[in-house]
């Protein structure tokens, strides 16, 4: 998809270098000569408008040869207005049409786009007028949001007109999965009606503008001109509708609505050491957050006695299963344990095919190892030939270890070991065997490096170390028995930062910085207005005001510039992107304080107050913006930072579907992703690949179809299907995550790590050998590579592609893994 005409260059002006944008050039107003007029949202003549659009699409499908033998409506309402079908009949017809067309999308990317447009027509048939939407009890908008929408209605309707003029037609043709995902996010209203896509963006922008207007520095950082509710609304509305940045799923579902939480991540460390207190903590803290649809990471390291941990795991497993029944946003729990926990071997065998017994099976709870460096140091001693290297497990008598990290941890561990306080000793090879076997068989445990997380934190944590991360392993926050970690997320759509400049596709850093600036203000605004389930979470949010700004479309952006992820130009660009993301986010946060807002609570005790920034903890970091960093460093010492944390690279599996770009910072999972679910087939073709293929065979449709057939036979592996075709040489860049050398992908994570002050949800993608086996050493070597690179997250999921077919085991229990040679 060509997005290059959406954003114009940004200019730099004002004391704080605000990136201004002339929004009158962002999207053109409605073209009166267009075949379909903009939505008349005042009187909602929906049926006739949709019938006309449906007629045009069916004509287009007929011309493409895709309607042969299929039922059509083909009603030209301009000639026969009395023949307009009912909205119910049109919706049913659209559903049948999409279901029949979906399989053919594998061969024609234009059809994939048209199917998306059909789904948007189905959405439009359920729209309601703006007043009806505002008063919906099922939507339950906050009073102050409703009040502002009414007060500034004339201004909002001008932005809505702009949306229907050019943004909406572009969104409607993004693709089928985008349309289906938007349909899922739009709020269900009374009488079978639904929030419209335009109302969806109005809700998000109005809610954020309402909160931003309560703290003037939020608004003034967006403009050097007049800063008020209207200009703030328009800024957010146009950026959101144009997908420059994308809010988190909880935000899209709940922002602006009463009694909801928009935070994505909650981190807990109850520090309970018996079953009774742990169950109390679950009841009082875990359950409310599950019901608020938040993802939870919880450390149970202190629950380290006899007959406790696995029974509590079973309780959590049942809670997750019950909480996710019939929910639009399923959630989950990840339990964090250190590898010296007395019950660690039982925990490693609680999921999937490795579950020792049904009574201890916990398929709805994830496990993460909060691993000390010492575990890997001992394994390296074994690899280097040392005999009888062991790993010792401890019970609660060694609880002091949870408070320590790095050298202090190692000294205390070895002291306890020498005094004979261990409850079991395991050969280090067997310990690693158990970890890798569980990962290869179930997708987890996730693996994070405790020492790296603590070393690079904003305060000195020695003596009270950080105990865990979140559900998806990208959030690193200090928690305790009285304070939960909380993080609100948004992702920058990097594909929207690629532009045609002098005939070449280039990355626009002004667009990137503008997107980060908007996302920083947006996330801070929604944090102000969001409810949190418990006082502990309220305390954590207020103490740190931690943000998690990530990315999506990383691979899509690089492909659109013709770059392989691992060539030198790509590696250089990778570092620059994340350096400027951190720079802009911290600049905005500092500006908040310069304009009168207080720094986060622990600022005076943080390294920031002494002028130390995150990348200062890394060796040999080369900065592109040395002068700007030096100035910002001085400003931070002088004024402070409003937020404690900024960049977190989360998975964007759901939100990247609305943008039709690659997930997070990972390579594309497949060039033709297909997954059968309980609601039907989820299909996502690589549109860039299919469009380029059409260009190559522009005058030879038979050859194009033959090439696609070859790709189908090769499970859409480019090298296998097209490696010998000289005309397809340019397509070899379309490698998938499984085609890349995983060590090189880890190197990309390492290159950007100095600028990621939280962490990265780094998944490993591994293919079995031809005989259907998987060597444990392959996984282990990658973990060692991540450890030596100094990463905080060593492995999120371990995804295994079967050698015999396209089946991929993703750790969700839907497919079984192949056998492993360990």
Swiss-Prot record:
- Annotated site residues (Interacts with thioredoxin/glutaredoxin) in this chain: 817, 820
Per the UniProt record, the site (Important for electron transfer) maps to 796-797
Q: Which PROSITE patterns match?
A: RIBORED_LARGE
Coiled-coil region(s): none
- What is the enzyme's main class? oxidoreductase
> Which residues are listed for substrate binding in this entry?
249, 264-265, 295, 470-474, 651-655
According to its UniProt entry, what is the function of this protein? Ribonucleoside-diphosphate reductase holoenzyme provides the precursors necessary for viral DNA synthesis. Allows virus growth in non-dividing cells, as well as reactivation from latency in infected hosts. Catalyzes the biosynthesis of deoxyribonucleotides from the corresponding ribonucleotides.
Q: What is the name listed in the Swiss-Prot or TrEMBL entry for this protein?
A: Ribonucleoside-diphosphate reductase large subunit
